[in-house]
């Protein structure tokens, strides 16, 4: 038969300890529940211009939202190659990504115009276009495609490397098997040079160069340095044939659910990330040639660019029909 003796009453000290423990438990739970974790992915290493972009962005988001949002950063295509990552953001399976503009025309065709060869005079010109009315209007074109484009950033001017021969004039490119991005404008232009184009995800490029699957590739100095392409490429020519922007992208439905103040915090964080990203590109461009030469690459930095432009005259005529001569001239003449 169970005892009917009353249980001892807890002391006031025990009650206070219990209350404190419950308070801490519920407090920690509330804090954990209040913090939303998101992910952002890049295709390059952390120690790169893209790494600077997303590391800065993650820090700024947490700071500007009082820690209510935490952005986890992933490098070396840990969450997928650029095209896969962009598609994942569009579908909502990933929250954020930072991508070069290479695969973007497959999702937002209006951005193709930015990939026309020799469209921009220099980085100052490109940045002025992207930060001005033309670039900001292009950002709005992402809204209807499942994205919120938070800010333009930078990959840089693209240059050609290969393991076969020094490229001093356009004819030297003929017959080279080159990895290209999955970008229709790039592919059309490189075919105009007589290049055998091989579209390939960035994560596969080093091995393809190492094994001789392709002869060469083209990328900005920042990418060539961080990817250590000097280990598998002998010749580099500073062609500067295409300017490659980059973008902070967020799933549109997710962005729309944020309070207005938080939306602005994400935009401002992306802009700060872009600012430091561009500074890193400037740094890499300033020291990159000397670094790569010291590592054994032959670097040609004095080509007659007008000859390369002339070699693409038939292709550029097609681009004028595709995009409109007036639209191209508007970009070329922007200050």
UniProtKB/Swiss-Prot annotation:
Subunit-structure text: The complex is comprised of an extracytoplasmic solute-binding protein and a heteromeric permease formed by two transmembrane proteins.
Keyword Transport: yes
Alphabetized GO MF terms: carbohydrate binding
Family, similarity comment: Belongs to the bacterial solute-binding protein 7 family.
Compartments where located: Periplasm
Protein source organism: Verminephrobacter eiseniae (strain EF01-2)
Secretion signal, residue range per the UniProt entry: 1-34
Any one GO biological process: transmembrane transport
InterPro entries noted in UniProt: DctP_fam (IPR018389), TRAP_DctP (IPR004682), TRAP_DctP_sf (IPR038404)
Binding residues for (R)-pantoate: 50, 82, 155-158, 179, 219
UniProt keyword annotations, A-Z: Periplasm, Signal, Transport
Function: Solute-binding protein that binds (R)-pantoate and D-erythronate (in vitro). Probably part of a tripartite ATP-independent periplasmic (TRAP) transport system that mediates solute transport into the cytoplasm.
Gene3D superfamilies in UniProt: Bacterial extracellular solute-binding protein, family 7 (3.40.190.170)
Domain of life: Bacteria
Protein's recorded name: Solute-binding protein Veis_3954
